[in-house]
Amino acid sequence: METANDKTNVQGIKEDPELILINISGADRPGVTAALTAILAQYDAMVLDIGQADIHHTLSLGILFRTTSSVSGEIMKDLLFKAYDLQVKI
């Protein structure tokens, strides 16, 4: 049974939707959230919720997003590399 969330890619392969929650922690600096959400935008991931706390210049950030199974691995790979560059942990 197909639902409104089911998508078919250009090759005609059905893509399953995935909800992913990532938790980011580390030193808070300008641009961390922007850099990570820019990656989500590159893959047309839909950000569903963001929660953030900054305690004594330490960032705790949670991002819930929806994507498809065909690109979720690539998104996570790119997020992990960017997190390494930004010196934060996912």
Predicted features by range, described:
Residues 2-90:
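A conserved regulatory-domain signal marking ACT and ACT-like small-molecule sensing domains
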